[in-house]
Amino acid sequence: QLSNDPIPYIRQLKQKTTSGTMISAGYGGGTANMEYMSLTGFNLSNFSPTLPTPYTQLVTHRKYNPNIAQSFPEAVAIHPYQGVYYSRTEVYKRFGFDRFYYLGSKYKIKYKKKIDRSPYLSDETAYKNALDQVKQANNGEFINLVTMQNHFPYDRNYYNNSDKYTPVGEGIDDYTRN
C-alpha cells in the first residue's frame, strides 16, 4: 500500500472508457515470453519446459508463425530501446510487421525523453511515438508497443522524487520504507 495514489489519471480513465485487467503469466522478467503469448495467443505452458524463449528458439526457425499482426492491413512494432534483444528484429519480420521502430533502426524513435536519472526512455515518450503512428494510419493498424520506463535494474536513486511515495503497512522494513 502506498501513501499516495501514483496513477490517479489512469484510474479516472478507467471510469470513462473500456478497460479491464490482464493476469500476467510472468513477473520480474521474461518480457519476450509475455509478448509471444500476447501476440500469438499460445500459452507457454503448452510447450516443453526445454523451450524457455520462443522468440529465439522457435519463431526464428519457422517459416510461418500465426499471430494477431497478420489480421491487420498494417502492423508496426515500437520498442524505445535496442531491437536486437530476444531477436526482436528477426521475430517481428517473421510475424509480418511492416515496420519496427527502435533505437538505431532505420525507422526513427522521434521522441526520446527520460525521467530523472533513468537510463530508459519514458512511457510518455513511448506513447507519443505510438500516437504518431496512429495519426499516420489510413486504415486499421496494429501497434505492438513495448515500453522500458520501469525496467530493472534500478535503485532508490532512479528517480529524483523517490520520497514522494512511501510504502506503508505491516511487514515493510526500514530499508524498503526509506
Locate each region found by the language model:
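Solvent-exposed soluble domains appended to multi-pass membrane proteins
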Residues: 2-178
